[in-house]
């Protein structure tokens, strides 16, 4: 991470921060406003979801957008910084088209296979191994999503506390690891212990609106932050000198002789391999496709495909704008979690503080929602024939939350979560399993048909993603 100097900054930046420190004194009113705004939107969403099984086209588009959108949007600028604008756009188009095509395969397979449950399609196609493959992939994806949400708490909550409390002198409540544990015990665990989701099931709508607000702020800040970033360059230069003096030279460090404010169109380095897994993680929504198909009013495969087309197009535009403006703002200095990068320029910014509070509220309330299906899967796998038990319910919940906390504490960055889950579980759910189900269950098309030959080659490049990541990791370890 790039550290900010203690009080010795460029005079323009200092004046700017002083102005924001003065404005920050009135921020509690704005903070209160954002929470009231969130509650109001949650009420609207509750009212909109009262009649299940009769979802309109527009509401289905909104629901699918909720399923697609997540923390993955925060890592897209980092992916663009390590691929370049042109290569990123090519990869984004490819992953979005392949993801949309796999939705087509999934809908067609569901009609032929006679089931609207992802795991049940796996069982009908390959028996218990197919069901286990689907269940494990969904569980891994949800654990990855939970971990990414808690990573956001780890990154952003100390910045919010510092904005209200003042300078960071090493207090325990400024440590992200302690804060993740505290938030998990005080807020997430009690909500996760609820037997039914209730109103928590609709916080995904609030989460989507928070991300839209975040995108607007990213675009706005692009025209407010100058380049070069004096504080960033100063601290990275000091860090580089310290590395050289200690004998450890970072071969991937930025060349400070080049123009760091000029965007690149093609970039190839050791981090480029993370781009496709990050994009895959950002587009995974396929386990939610079939339940939404079941709830669609006057449902047909063509109508649901139209819902998917509109949702994917909207998310494609949002992802492209967030990645592009985040990259153009920070260029090579962008971090794996975009929102955290702004703390390197702004010590106290009211708008960014509201964004952080909104995102923190959304992800904290979303963790119990994501944990719910994981706990259900574990219960079905281990104790399907047993009656409900509060003791078992509590033990499974605490175990899942504790393991996720350990991941967040010991995994170095959110980039590793995006990369690993995107290369494994997300790739399985988007590319490999829908193709395998289609080949096995759709009988009316022969194996030598153009459709099935194309589908058989469809997952092959993405199935090798974990091997590529392991190969790169081994190379880096060998160099070390």
Write out the residue ranges for each language-model feature.
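Membrane-embedded helix-loop-helix hairpins and adjacent transmembrane boundary segments
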Residues: 407-415, 419-421
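Intrinsically disordered, low-complexity regions flanking or connecting the multi-pass transmembrane cores
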Residues: 1-410, 429-480
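Claisen-condensing/thiolase-fold acyl-transfer catalytic domains that form or cleave C-C bonds
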Residues: 426
């Amino acid at each position: 991470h790039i550290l900010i100097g203690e009080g010795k900054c460029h005079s323009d930046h200092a004046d700017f921060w002083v102005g924001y420190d003065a404005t920050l004194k009135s921020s509690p009113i704005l903070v209160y406003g954002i929470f009231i705004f969130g509650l109001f939107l949650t009420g609207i969403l509750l009212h909109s979801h009262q009649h299940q099984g009769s979802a309109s086209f527009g509401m289905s588009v909104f629901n699918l957008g909720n399923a697609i959108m997540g923390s993955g949007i925060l890592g897209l600028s980092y992916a663009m910084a390590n691929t370049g604008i042109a290569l990123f756009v090519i990869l984004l188009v490819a992953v979005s088209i392949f993801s949309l095509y796999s939705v087509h395969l999934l809908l067609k397979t569901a009609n032929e296979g006679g089931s609207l449950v992802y795991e049940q399609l796996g069982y009908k196609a390959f028996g218990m191994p197919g069901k286990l493959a689907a269940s494990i992939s969904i569980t891994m994806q949800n654990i990855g999503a939970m971990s990414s949400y808690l990573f956001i708490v780890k990154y952003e909550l100390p910045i919010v506390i510092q904005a209200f409390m003042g300078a960071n002198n090493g207090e325990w409540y400024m440590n992200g690891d302690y804060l993740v544990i505290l938030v998990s015990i005080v807020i997430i665990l009690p909500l996760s212990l609820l037997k039914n989701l209730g109103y928590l099931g609709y916080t995904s709508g609030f989460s989507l609106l928070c991300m839209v607000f975040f995108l607007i702020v990213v675009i706005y800040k692009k025209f407010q932050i100058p380049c070069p970033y004096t504080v960033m360059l100063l601290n990275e230069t000091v860090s580089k000198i310290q590395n050289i003096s200690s004998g450890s030279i970072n071969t991937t460090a930025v060349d400070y002789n080049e123009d760091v404010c000029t965007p690149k169109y093609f970039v190839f380095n050791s981090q480029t391999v993370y781009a496709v897994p990050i994009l895959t993680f950002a587009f995974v929504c396929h386990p939610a496709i079939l339940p939404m198909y079941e709830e669609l009013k006057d449902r047909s495969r063509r109508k649901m495909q139209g819902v998917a087309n509109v949702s994917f197009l909207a998310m494609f535009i949002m992802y492209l704008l967030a990645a592009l403006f985040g990259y153009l703002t920070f260029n090579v200095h962008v971090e794996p979690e975009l929102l955290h990068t702004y703390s390197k320029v702004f010590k106290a910014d009211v708008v960014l503080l509201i964004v952080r509070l909104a995102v923190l509220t959304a992800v904290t309330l979303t963790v119990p929602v994501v944990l719910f299906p994981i706990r259900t899967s574990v219960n079905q796998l281990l104790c399907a024939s047993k009656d409900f038990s509060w003791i078992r319910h509590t033990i499974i919940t605490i175990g899942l939350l504790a393991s996720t906390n350990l991941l967040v504490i010991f995994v170095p960055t959110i980039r590793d979560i995006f990369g690993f889950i995107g290369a494994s579980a997300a790739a399985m759910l988007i590319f490999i399993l829908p193709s395998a189900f289609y080949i096995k269950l759709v009988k009316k098309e022969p194996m030598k048909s153009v459709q099935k030959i194309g589908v058989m080659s469809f997952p092959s490049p993405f199935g090798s993603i974990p091997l590529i990541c392991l190969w790169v990791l081994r190379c880096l370890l060998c160099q070390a």
